[in-house]
Amino acid sequence: MRYTYVRQHDTTDCAAACLAMVCLHYKKEITITRLRDMMGTDLKGTNLTGMEKAAQELGFSTAAVRVDRENFLSEFTTPCIAQVITDEGLAHFVTVFKKTTIKDDGERRRHMLRQEEERKKCADEGKKFRCRDYVIIGDPAKELKKISLDEFYKNFTGVLLLMTPTSEFKTGKQKQGSMVKRFLDLLWPQKKLFFYAILSSVILTIIGIASSMYNKILMDEILPYGLKSLLVAVILVFSIVNVTSALISMVRQWVLIYLSIKVDIPLMLGYFGHVFKLPMKFFATRKTGEITTRYSDASTIKSVFTSIALSVVMDIVMACVTGVILFRMNATLFSISIFTTLLSILLVFIFKQPFKRINEETMQQSAILNSQMIESLRGIETVKCNAEEDRELEALEREYIKSLKISLRSSKISTVQSLISTLITTILGMVTSYVGIMQVLNGEMTLGGYMAFSTLSSYFTNPVSELVGLQMSIQQAQISIKRLTEIMDYESEQDETREYTEMEKIDGDIEFKDVSFRYGSRSPALSHVSFTIPYGKKVALVGSSGSGKSTITKLLLKYYEPESGTISVGGVDLDEYSNRSVRRAIAYVPQNVELFSKTIYDNIRISRPEASLDEVKAAAKKADAHEFIRKLPLQYNTYLEEAGNGLSGGEKQRLALARAFLKDANLYILDESTSSLDFGTENTIFDMIYNQLADRSMLIVAHRLSTIRDCDLILVMDHGEIVERGTHEELLEKQGKYYELWSLQQGIFRDKKRGSKPIAPVSAAKVVEDEDDGESITY
């Protein structure tokens, strides 16, 4: 039986890789990236619900079951997917291809009893029990392997996903773009350079073949007859030939370098250009290290297709030309060379799978190690404040040691292959020497002819030796092509062939109508949400963390599409507008402020690149950022460190607010935009918002309720639903969820025993009602 094993690309790909194995078993080829999207894989991985949903979408009939050890031996459809817990304590999926099966219920029970008796007997005798029941599994993180049922049950949770293809299941291969074609499209504009590289290679080949005749002329013509005058001429001619060869070789190398650079620019920038067009869910479900390692994949492909591919093509041409010449010179010696070549080619095929497996492991572990380093460095403040440097270093060391072990195994495989290749070349080289010299001694061949054959034969055998040496690089390129193609085939967030309306300004009401949404296959983040933001009005979203407030802002920014329902602006469906124009028309301040390694001036005007310094200063004053910027050494020309390190959280938020105010949009979305500010600065900013921006529409997400009490409408969210709506005063009168949140923030708590009457805790400060605005103020 052929087992269709697929290795996972990244740490969260195990479920997708397992489903890909099952699909391949039934003659359907589909990419891991496509399966990730279908099952809703995110940074936490994939749950069983998502995997079952994807399998059903592909045309499988599914059943998620829990089995004990006895029932696992019963007959059921394989391959299936099993949930296991890794040695590190992480949930993981593997594919079960084959196992010990006992169909009869009675025989199965007797089998279990016999095993239990043998187990006890071995324990009494101090022997190790050997389980004869087996399981063949495809572990996407490791390998295809056959293990005992005892070993399997050490990690097996008992959960299986059984799958059977229905009439709706379609075999075949998912249509994929060709990375080779993409690369050839990049090479075509550089066809002149490529032609020069090939031409120089052809000239070098001709010169090389001609040079091999030097020894023949020397041994057969000059030495036997003592032609001293001819000796000088021959040496002079071949010296000129060798110098010419060196110069052409140098020119060829420069052409290849220049060709590499010309291809490098569109390839690398093309990759990142495509990545920037991908939807937010692509980034939300992948670690940064996993994305950046694809950049290395692009570099590997470029290296193979420029220098290596050209060399291999020319080496093959050279082998064919010299093969014909060698055959005409001496068929016997040529047959030995052919045998050497065939053995070398066989060696390449023998080591193909080991190299493929080790390269896949290397690339996967490289992504894990990169992600670990990036996370550790990004969270260095958290690491240090918790004195967890040693623990983080241990985690990094653990992943690095895994990388070293994989590298060691790779080196062992390369060494073994190289040793076998050397032995083949050496032994058959000695055989060639013996046969050739015997022919010279028997007068069947001249000494010069033998030496010419020996020199020329290297042009025939060397290409194959080069191919053996390049096998690791070629395998890496093949895997890189597969990994990179899956990213390049990932659909952009908007169909580039469709015409969209460009939004200039948001003029009109914004309406959410029965909108539902979920991240991947998780529980719904929003359930049938409906509300309207009237033009020029201020609407607030409040509620506990995870209630769906930020999700609404992301849908409005078109980071994600609603699962159901519609969002409209001025009566026009938001889907009709291009993503870029919608985002340009909205001034958004996110929870997590991202600053770049640029000047403060450049960081603020990222929302309006053409803005002047005076306009940037005006926006900074609105955000109450001008004063702290003015105190910096170079003021607005001060260069920020990576991610704005060196600035406080409040200073970062003020710069983010300045960006938004500079945009001067008709709609502002403020998502916890003042959470790091002191009360004085926060009040100053909201005073400006409610007065200077009174005619602008606003969606304000806030936990600090005092900032949104003057909003025209407050929406209270809980578990993805709007549970209350109204003004501040109306919601307080209802004494519902909003009243609870407000009371908690004022230091007032409900007495659960006495009902809803609010009481102050013993340690609470005295609460005084301000007669002017009715806000509870704690002194």
Task: Specify the residue positions occupied by each region the protein language model found.
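Transmembrane helices of ABC transporter permease
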Residues: 236-245, 249, 311-361, 431-445, ...
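Transmembrane helix-loop-helix hairpins at lipid-water interfaces of multipass membrane proteins
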Residues: 194-248, 255, 327-332, 443-447
